[in-house]
A protein has these predicted regions:
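His/Asp/Glu-rich metal-coordinating catalytic cores
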Residues: 1-119, 123-129, 134, 140-147
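Acidic, Ser/Thr-rich peripheral helices and adjacent loops at domain boundaries
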Residues: 133-167
Length: 167
């Protein structure tokens, strides 16, 4: 994309928040790369590798890098796939209701819990906000959506129903 004298190129990056991008901004023979919160332990590490491939051999004048962590002190980094396997093991050990607290904007984590519920023959019950997130991103990426996937349901608190009927 060209904006005035600037050429801006976006690169999809594997991030816990859906739709994040790295940006290469070029003008007058100079370039700035903003990496976004780049990571290799998510569900799509190929995105970061592609960014590295595309930019290898190119000169970047300034790089702005964001990161929430740069590894684990003991070197035992857990991927989202490994975390999903651990969730499945824990859910299989639980005799009854399983509750989890995480941000539904962390789409990889949300997907891990939904997939874990399916693998353990349980129903994933989302709050209204989580259902909204799933609905919004379903047009961009294949995710289970309440109403279309029988193992994903939505919990509507009575106060939500009461306020909806008053309108």
């Amino acid at each position: 994309t060209t904006i005035g004298a600037f050429t801006v190129t976006g690169f999809a990056v594997d991030h816990s928040i859906f739709g994040c991008l790295a940006y290469l901004i070029e003008a007058d023979g100079k370039s700035i790369l903003y990496t976004g919160d780049i990571r290799l332990h998510g569900r799509k590490p190929g995105m970061a590798k592609r960014l590295i491939e595309v930019l290898s051999g190119r000169s970047v004048d300034v790089m702005l890098m964001e990161g929430t962590h740069f590894g684990f002190p003991d070197g035992n980094e857990v991927t989202e796939y490994e975390l999903e396997d651990e969730i499945v093991d824990l859910v299989n050990q639980a005799p009854g209701l399983v509750l989890a607290s995480f941000s539904p904007q962390h789409v990889d984590r949300l997907v891990a819990f939904i997939r874990s519920a399916k693998k353990t023959n349980r129903t994933f019950v989302a709050d209204v906000y989580t259902a909204f997130i799933l609905h919004m991103i379903s047009s961009e990426t294949p995710v289970p959506v309440p109403g279309k996937d029988e193992l994903v349901r939505v919990y509507y608190p009575r106060t939500f129903e009461d306020s909806a009927t008053r309108r």
